[in-house]
């Protein structure tokens, strides 16, 4: 055939293919128009976190036996445990316990391997501050339980989490 005719046929096939791809993209766009919005109005609406959410660590001072398992399993050796050996009872007495949440990666190893369950993860995720030194929590700050999102009447909670399709 003539080269001009074959180029014209290729041009026609490419035009049809391009129109099909544009149509497929347009159909996907139209299918998303029926869905609910994914974003929420953050300060006024909050999602209720899942049961296994890894938020700020809660620490119970009375349960801790200063075994330092949390320090050994932490990938960045983060918890600082100060203790004193009581010679009369031959046990360690915990003096100070602190975690710097500016460095913590929230892996949950300390909570998982703690033999006395004195560490637990909370649903608190709003840890932002203007000074990074405020992220270093001692045992008093770690012992405070966060206010539950459900109990706050000024915040509308969003219960329906988007389902992940696999």
Curated annotation (Swiss-Prot):
Belongs to the complex I 23 kDa subunit family. NDH shuttles electrons from NAD(P)H:plastoquinone, via FMN and iron-sulfur (Fe-S) centers, to quinones in the photosynthetic chain and possibly in a chloroplast respiratory chain. The immediate electron acceptor for the enzyme in this species is believed to be plastoquinone. Couples the redox reaction to proton translocation, and thus conserves the redox energy in a proton gradient. It comes from the Eukaryota. InterPro entries: 4Fe4S_Fe-S-bd, 4Fe4S_Fe_S_CS, NADH_quinone_OxRdtase_chainI, NDHI. Its cofactor is [4Fe-4S] cluster. GO terms for cellular component: chloroplast thylakoid membrane. Keywords: 4Fe-4S, Chloroplast, Iron, Iron-sulfur, Membrane, Metal-binding, NAD, NADP, Plastid, Plastoquinone, Quinone, Repeat, Thylakoid, Translocase. Binds 2 [4Fe-4S] clusters per subunit. Residues 55-84, 95-124 form the 4Fe-4S ferredoxin-type domain. HAMAP family: NDH1_NuoI. Its main location: plastid. GO terms for molecular function: 4 iron, 4 sulfur cluster binding; iron ion binding; NADH dehydrogenase (ubiquinone) activity; quinone binding. GO terms for biological process: photosynthesis, light reaction. [4Fe-4S] cluster 1 binds at residues 64, 67, 70, 114. Its EC number is 7.1.1.-. The keyword Cell inner membrane does not apply. [4Fe-4S] cluster 2 binds at residues 74, 104, 107, 110. It is a peripheral membrane protein. This is NAD(P)H-quinone oxidoreductase subunit I, chloroplastic. NDH is composed of at least 16 different subunits, 5 of which are encoded in the nucleus. It is found in: Plastid, Chloroplast thylakoid membrane.
């Amino acid at each position: 055939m003539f080269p001009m005719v074959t180029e014209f046929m290729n041009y026609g096939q490419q035009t049809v293919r391009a129109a099909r791809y544009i149509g497929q993209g347009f159909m996907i766009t139209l299918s998303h128009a029926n869905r609910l919005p994914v974003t929420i109005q953050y300060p006024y609406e909050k999602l209720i976190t899942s049961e296994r959410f890894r938020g700020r660590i809660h620490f119970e001072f009375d349960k801790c036996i200063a075994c330092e398992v949390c320090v050994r399993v932490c990938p960045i050796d983060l918890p600082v445990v100060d203790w004193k050996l009581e010679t009369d009872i031959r046990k360690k007495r915990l003096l100070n316990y602190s975690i710097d949440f500016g460095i913590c990666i929230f892996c949950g190893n300390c909570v998982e391997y703690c033999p006395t369950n004195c560490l637990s993860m909370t649903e608190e995720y709003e840890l932002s501050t203007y000074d990074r030194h405020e992220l270093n929590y001692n045992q008093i700050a770690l012992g405070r339980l966060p206010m539950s999102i459900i109990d706050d009447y000024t915040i509308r909670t969003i219960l329906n989490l988007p389902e992940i399709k696999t």
